[in-house]
Amino acid sequence: MSLRFAVSNEIELKPLARNISRSISNNQIILFEGEAGSGKTTLIRYILSEISKSEKKTFSFQGSPTYQREHIYNFNKFNIIHFDFYQVQNNKLDLDEYFYDYCIFIEWPLENLIKRYNHMALSISISVTGKKRNIEIK
């Protein structure tokens, strides 16, 4: 089953981000796919912001971890590790060591990670059509 949404601006992402933020926990993997500039990082920022609001906690988004490869966000209910594998060539990456302690967000997931974790991951694909973002969640 998949859900599809079309948004015309960032503000329209907030309700979607709120719903996603309410459904995540440790031991979960979320794959964010889409071309550069499609809004993957923006959606992640909104999801993290919604978690922060629900916990009444100060939050500072660290941006996309393109060059550091990962950022960790500690919340009361769970922790999130945000990976960005843009331009990463190592297909031998393994997430098992993170799975039990984090909810794992992955931008630009590598093919081997998609194959290995797809059965247990939430996949969010964003495509661009004109000024609209088409979001598919499955």
State what each model feature region is.
Residues 35:
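P-loop (Walker A) phosphate-binding loop of NTP-binding proteins
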Residues 63-111:
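Conserved nucleotide-sensing/catalytic segment adjacent to the nucleotide-binding pocket
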Residues 97-138:
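Short phosphate-coordinating micro-motif centered on Lys-Gly-acidic
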Residues 1-19:
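N-terminal pre-Walker A segment at the start of P-loop NTPase domains
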Residues 49-61, 75:
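Post-Walker A helix-loop "phosphate-sensing" segment adjacent to the P-loop in P-loop NTPases
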Residues 30-32:
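Hydrophobic anchor at the beta1->P-loop junction of P-loop NTPases
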